[in-house]
Amino acid sequence: MKKILVIGSLNVDMVVNVPHMPVAGETILAGNMELVPGGKGANQAYAAGRLGAQVTMFGAVGDDSYSDIEKKSLASVGVDTSHLLVRKEKSTGLAWISVNSEGDNSIVVIQGANATLTESDIAAHEDLLRDCDILLCQLEIPLKTVIYAAKRAKEFGKTVILDPAPVPKEFPEELFSYIDVIKPNEKEAAQLLGEPVTNYEE
């Protein structure tokens, strides 16, 4: 069985149902709030674990109850979370998601501990890169950290897969040279190409 290492973000999504999106200065009453494990990195790890893969999640969380929500969710599908870094001075990443009656949403992301993951953290845990077969990355952690992780993974002969979200204003050409598979959605593909994408063949 292939070993998958996910290096990336862990967020807890606070999903709030609202009758309509508030405008500046407006106070509205929400229906309810639900705490949902999320973060693009954790979502990748959860999906791979649910499919039966051998998965390790590497990232940074806070020393709080939100990190417990993430760990419990990932553990439920067999993902190894023993290498997560705990930042006592930061909260676990959070996302405030308002959803109106038509299903439209607005999202505010608080990076929290995700923003603290560094190249030095990756270097200190290179045994995880050496031991995996596939590296999965996204861009909700510092870009320099992603580039370093992808570069080292390629040097170790690993397959590197990138979910290029959120797409940075200037996508570093260097990162392309370390990627084997890139999986943007339609909007992200258009941002990367600098032009609309209207069909799969394009």
What residue ranges belong to the model's regions?
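Conserved phosphate/ATP/ADP-binding segment of small-molecule kinases
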Residues: 150, 154-202
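Glycine-rich phosphate/adenosyl-contacting loop at the front of the ribokinase-like
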Residues: 1-60, 65-79
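Active-site-proximal loop->helix
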Residues: 65-77, 95-103, 125
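Conserved phosphate-binding/catalytic loop of the ribokinase/pfkB sugar-kinase fold
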Residues: 82-87, 97-134, 139
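Structural detector of well-ordered beta-strand residues that form the stable sheet scaffold
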Residues: 5, 56, 136, 161-163, ...
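Residues that scaffold the ATP/ADP-binding catalytic core of kinase and kinase-like folds
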Residues: 15, 108, 191-195
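Cofactor-binding loop segments of dinucleotide-utilizing enzymes, especially the Rossmann-like FAD-
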Residues: 9, 59-63, 86, 99-101, ...
